[in-house]
A protein has these predicted regions:
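A short acidic/small-residue loop/turn micro-motif
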Residues: 141-143, 190-191, 215
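Acidic, glycine-rich catalytic/binding loops that coordinate metals and/or anionic ligands
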Residues: 57-59, 152-154, 159, 163-165, ...
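Hydrophobic membrane-insertion alpha-helices, especially the h-region
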Residues: 24-43
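Short histidine-centered loop motifs in beta-beta connectors
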Residues: 118-122, 126, 176-204
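Conserved positions in beta-strands of structured domains
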Residues: 132-134, 189, 211
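Surface-exposed, glycine-biased beta-strand/turn segments
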Residues: 40-170, 203, 253-261
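Structural recognition of the beta-strand scaffold that forms the well-ordered cores
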Residues: 109, 127, 173-176, 183-186, ...
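N-terminal Lys/Arg-rich, disordered targeting/topogenic segments
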Residues: 1-23
Length: 261
């Protein structure tokens, strides 16, 4: 019997004769899902590298690499504890009275739940801006109880000298910024491994950990009362907020001091 070849279906083949129409739609979907998961995995890996410093514990080494987000973020200070905001309690702002030493607060106190995030012993502390470390109290030792009580009696009677304030601040890190302002971090429990005077640090880099050094609880050797005291000193040796007339003005000015994260 004759066959009408003009009515045969036309089959499109590759040079090797493979019929690509034989691949079912499900295989295309599986291939697309595989590519998506590969891209998502790479993106997540990059994000984890940027967040790695905030997950360190026990003084582990911190990479000096700066995530690309740091170079594109707006200028200004980052809060020294990620996620923190201005303390809700005015007593934790600069110029708030400190009657126990006949003076005023010279910085911001991040304590308890007043700053939008819990402040716990060992919470990572970051550099609020690029700068150079000019002080790092790695070998800090607490006063004994007798020395502590003597210091409190002295500042209650006569007010606190700069040396007295240094002892009251506990373990500290100071960072000098390119504009010659100095950031002071106080009451730290520990300093990041490898951090030393003269070292450059970058905004967002972990530099230390929240503690209670230089406080009653620190003297007693407990982990209670954890806080971070953070001061911003101007090149003319005045602290941020010093010339404000009211705490309301300090709070308003502080809103433009910090830009995140």
């Amino acid at each position: 019997m004759d066959v009408d070849h003009n009515n045969e279906p036309t089959v499109t083949t590759h040079r090797d004769g493979f019929d690509w129409r034989s691949i079912k739609l499900g295989w295309y979907i599986l291939a697309a899902l595989f590519l998506y998961s590969l891209i998502a995995t790479i993106a997540l890996s990059r994000s984890n590298r940027a967040l790695n410093e905030l997950k360190l514990a026990g003084g582990s080494a911190v990479s000096s690499e700066t995530p690309s987000a740091l170079t594109t973020a707006p200028r200004g200070l980052w809060f020294p504890i990620p996620g923190a905001r201005l303390p809700q309690d005015d007593m934790y702002l600069p110029t708030a009275p400190r009657d126990y030493r006949r003076g005023v607060n010279q910085g911001f106190d991040f304590y308890g739940t007043s700053s939008a995030v819990p402040i716990n012993f060992g919470t990572p502390v970051i550099a609020s801006a690029d700068g150079v470390v000019i002080r790092a109290d790695r070998d800090y030792k607490e006063l004994d109880n007798e020395q502590w009580l003597s210091l409190l009696d002295k500042v209650a009677a006569d007010g606190a000298t700069e040396d007295d304030l240094n002892r009251l601040r506990g373990r500290q890190i100071w960072i000098r910024l390119p504009d010659n302002r100095v950031l002071r971090y106080a009451h730290l429990s520990d300093i990041r491994q490898g951090l030393a005077e003269g070292q450059e640090v970058y905004r967002g880099q972990v530099i230390g950990f929240v503690g209670n050094s230089g406080t009653d609880d620190g003297i007693k050797g407990t982990t209670r009362g954890a806080r971070l005291h953070f001061e911003v000193w101007n090149p003319d040796n005045t602290f941020f907020g010093q010339n404000a007339e009211t705490l309301e003005q300090v709070r308003a000015d502080s809103a433009s001091l910090f830009v995140g994260p």
